From Swiss-Prot:
Reported function: Catalyzes the condensation of carbamoyl phosphate and aspartate to form carbamoyl aspartate and inorganic phosphate, the committed step in the de novo pyrimidine nucleotide biosynthesis pathway.
EC number(s) from the headed UniProt entry: 2.1.3.2
Species the sequence originates in: Thermococcus onnurineus (strain NA1)
Designated gene of the protein: pyrB
Binding site for carbamoyl phosphate: R57, T58, R107, H135, Q138, L268, P269
Protein name: Aspartate carbamoyltransferase catalytic subunit
Record: residues binding L-aspartate: K86, R168, R229
Length: 310
């Protein structure tokens, strides 16, 4: 597989071999970072970060990743300060920005925006989230986090909790987990169940899938509990949001019958779905998960720029 110039738009564009290759490169980069703190693979290269939606971790970890590779960063964190406010099209914005950069990272509220950007641009485009559709780099760092914690992904029982209808992180993650020998527990309110087509695809690929509303009854079965925020901004109807707001909270009482080895993950930001008391337990893995974004995104940037090899 030729990585130089490759777009990263959807988990569906990856094979299991692709995923394992990225995780291997990320692990190697993390080891080198721990020794040196700063690398020079991308010296002279420029990353453009185009964030049409709010972001803390994704934007900053991409910027950190590029700086740690020795490259530079330009971009914006809000469309309000760009010519989009004057009516400029997404295509024209992309064609303009690629004149200044070597790789583009884009987050946009419209599903399919990253794919459109990739079709227009002649430089690599990396999807940092397009509406409620896909978030492939989050998925890769999630898999990396799990593998670093357990030494494997195969054989694990993994629960996805919360907004499974609109949550792009769980859509991408579920699709990627289908490459592995895992058992999935989909825990959500009835109104926020995983889209039917994703569940059907998982089962067609041989994944054992359980759908439930019962968090406490499911926790003892799990090796990983992946918690998501119920995303108010994704709901077309405020009343629909109010019906499911605060449906679940992971706290020490909920975890009383959990395996000692259970790890809790969250793509963040959290609101109240994980109580802060959980932060002090051995179960909490979400801040290590945040760190994983740096080596994984370093790997993706380096590979697509052609400055890293296997």
């Amino acid at each position: 597989m030729e990585w130089k110039g490759r777009d990263v738009i959807s988990v569906r564009d990856f094979s299991k071999e692709d995923i394992e290759f990225v995780l291997k490169i990320a692990e190697r980069l993390e080891e080198r970072l721990n020794k040196k703190g700063h690398l020079e693979y991308a010296r002279g290269k420029i990353l453009a970060t185009l964030f049409f939606e709010p972001s803390t971790r994704t934007r900053l970890s991409f910027e950190s990743a590029m700086h740690r590779l020795g490259g530079s960063v330009i971009g914006f964190s809000s469309a309000a300060s760009t010519s989009v406010k004057k009516g400029e099209s997404l295509a024209d914005t992309i064609k303009t920005v690629e004149q200044y950069s070597d790789v583009i990272v884009i987050r946009h509220p419209m599903e399919g925006a990253a794919r459109l950007a990739a079709e227009v641009a002649e430089i690599p485009v990396i999807n940092a989230g397009d509406g409620s559709n896909q978030h492939p780099t989050q998925t890769l760092l999630d898999l990396y986090t799990i593998k670093r914690a357990f030494g494997r992904i195969d054989g694990l029982r993994i629960g996805l909790l919360g907004d499974l209808k609109y949550g792009r992180t769980v859509h991408s993650l579920a699709e990627a987990l289908a490459f592995y020998d895992v058992e999935l527990y989909l825990i959500s309110p009835e109104l926020l169940r995983m889209p039917k087509h994703i569940v059907e695809e998982l089962r067609e690929k041989g994944v054992k899938v359980h759908e439930t509303t019962d968090l406490e009854g499911t926790v003892p079965e799990l090796d990983v509990l992946y918690v998501t925020r119920i995303q108010r901004e994704r709901f077309p109807d405020e009343q629909e949001y109010l019906k499911v707001k605060g449906s679940y909270q992971v706290n020490c009482a909920v975890l009383k019958n959990a395996k000692e080895s259970l790890k809790i993950m969250h793509p963040l930001p959290r609101v109240d779905e994980i109580h802060p008391e959980v932060d002090r337990t051995p179960h909490a893995l979400y801040f290590r998960q945040v760190f994983s974004g740096v080596p994984v995104r370093m790997a993706l940037l380096g590979l697509t720029l052609g400055v890293l090899e296997g």
